């Protein structure tokens, strides 16, 4: 009975999960009349007018928006992995006063809403004169309480004998950290993907810090939803479809690494 019930339940969950994405993709070829017609799944014709309008440059340079978002999310994810992994390594293997206090401070940062810190981050960036460019926005998100706690737990599972062996050989803690990075590569992939997803959909801080000609994807999607533009609904849906493609490709490429990290986390 369980062998029969499990595939049916799995298929039902997959169908429910995939339906919104399938509807959004098919609706990107529809007219407004077809979109608002109840029960209509397939378009009358697969006319890619919405995609042509996006890449025509009449609304904004969508290619530049896509590349800008990729650079921002990818760069911030890489630097966030390095910074939070180094902090987690220090908290897990270092011996200094205040280590426990720093760990609990990282936990409190997770509980504090990021939206409430946006104005403080903007003021900090303004004083450093790094507003209005991607590098300043990238720098503002590299420190994460979630990443610190995650990598602290990851490095606690690394045997202390490896650290002691490196010390016997006269290696510095900095060198030890980079030596251990290949051992935690699945964890790096997992957190990197998570941080990429979070940065990919960040809206408030880019809205505060970037110029109007430096749109990221969330800002571009919000601009398409502005009623003053009078764009067809299919254009916004087409932009949403294109915005999801990098996420699917990234997760599909690193899926095995993520699964390995999650399995190790559950076992431990």
Residue ranges and their predicted role:
Residues 1-268:
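A hydrophobic, multi-pass inner-membrane permease signature
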């Amino acid at each position: 009975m369980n062998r029969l019930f499990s595939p049916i339940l799995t298929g039902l969950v997959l169908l429910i999960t995939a339906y919104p994405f399938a509807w959004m993709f098919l609706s990107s070829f529809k007219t407004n009349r077809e979109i608002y017609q109840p029960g209509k799944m397939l378009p009358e014709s697969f006319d890619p007018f919405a995609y042509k309008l996006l890449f025509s440059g009449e609304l904004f340079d969508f290619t530049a928006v896509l590349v800008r978002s990729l650079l921002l999310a990818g760069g911030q994810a890489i630097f966030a992995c390095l910074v939070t992994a180094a902090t987690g390594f220090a908290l897990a293997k270092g011996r200094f006063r205040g280590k426990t206090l720093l760990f609990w401070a990282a936990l409190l940062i997770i509980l504090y809403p990021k939206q409430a810190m946006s104005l403080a981050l903007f003021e900090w960036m303004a004083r450093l004169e790094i507003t209005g460019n991607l590098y300043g926005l990238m720098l503002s998100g590299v420190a994460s309480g979630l990443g610190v706690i995650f990598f602290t737990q990851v490095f606690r599972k690394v045997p202390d004998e490896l650290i002691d062996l490196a010390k016997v050989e006269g290696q510095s803690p900095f060198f030890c950290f980079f030596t251990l990075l290949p051992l935690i590569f699945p964890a790096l992939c997992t957190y990197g993907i998570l941080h990429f997803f979070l940065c990919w959909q960040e809206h408030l801080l880019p809205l505060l810090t970037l110029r109007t000609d430096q749109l990221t994807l969330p800002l571009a999607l919000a601009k398409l939803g502005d009623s003053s533009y009078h764009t067809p609904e299919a254009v916004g849906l087409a932009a949403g479809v294109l915005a999801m493609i990098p996420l699917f490709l990234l997760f599909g490429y690193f899926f095995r690494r993520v699964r390995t990290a999650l399995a190790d986390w559950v076992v431990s």
